């Protein structure tokens, strides 16, 4: 009585088919498959962006900084 026999499973499947119908179950499975595909695609996109290295930035010490013009000509300096 505690274990489920094959007849119990047949009755359960028959009730599910009667409640949902074949069309709804196939639509549901299609939606699940689309969700899994979208999830896998999102995971692949995340891996691609993580693998892409950031460009190396260099500093040119000889070039003056933009907007940093020196205007100390003619200014008074105190010692």
Curated annotation (Swiss-Prot):
The terms describing its cellular component in GO are:
TAT protein transport complex
**GO terms, molecular function:** protein transmembrane transporter activity
The answer to whether keyword Magnesium applies is: no
> Which keywords annotate this record?
Cell inner membrane, Cell membrane, Membrane, Protein transport, Translocation, Transmembrane, Transmembrane helix, Transport
Regions of biased composition (Basic and acidic residues) lie at 43-60
The leader peptide range reads none
What kind of membrane protein is this, topologically?
A: Single-pass membrane protein
Which locations, inside or outside the cell, does it occupy? Cell inner membrane
Question: Annotated region Disordered: where?
Answer: 43-79
- The domain of life is Bacteria
Transmembrane annotation, as ranges:
1-21
The GO biological-process annotations, alphabetized, read as: protein transport by the Tat complex
Give the quaternary structure.
The Tat system comprises two distinct complexes: a TatABC complex, containing multiple copies of TatA, TatB and TatC subunits, and a separate TatA complex, containing only TatA subunits. Substrates initially bind to the TatABC complex, which probably triggers association of the separate TatA complex to form the active translocon.
| Protein function | Part of the twin-arginine translocation (Tat) system that transports large folded proteins containing a characteristic twin-arginine motif in their signal peptide across membranes. TatA could form the protein-conducting channel of the Tat system.
Return the similarity comment: Belongs to the TatA/E family.
Q: What is this protein called?
A: Sec-independent protein translocase protein TatA
Query: Which source organism?
Result: Nitrobacter hamburgensis (strain DSM 10229 / NCIMB 13809 / X14)
């Amino acid at each position: 009585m505690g274990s489920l026999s094959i007849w119990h499973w047949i009755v359960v499947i028959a009730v599910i088919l009667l409640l949902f119908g074949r069309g709804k179950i196939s639509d549901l499975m299609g939606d699940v498959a689309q969700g899994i595909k979208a999830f896998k695609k999102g995971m692949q996109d995340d891996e691609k962006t993580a693998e892409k290295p950031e460009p190396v930035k260099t500093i040119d010490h000889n070039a003056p900084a933009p907007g940093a013009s020196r205007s100390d000509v003619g200014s008074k300096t105190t010692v």
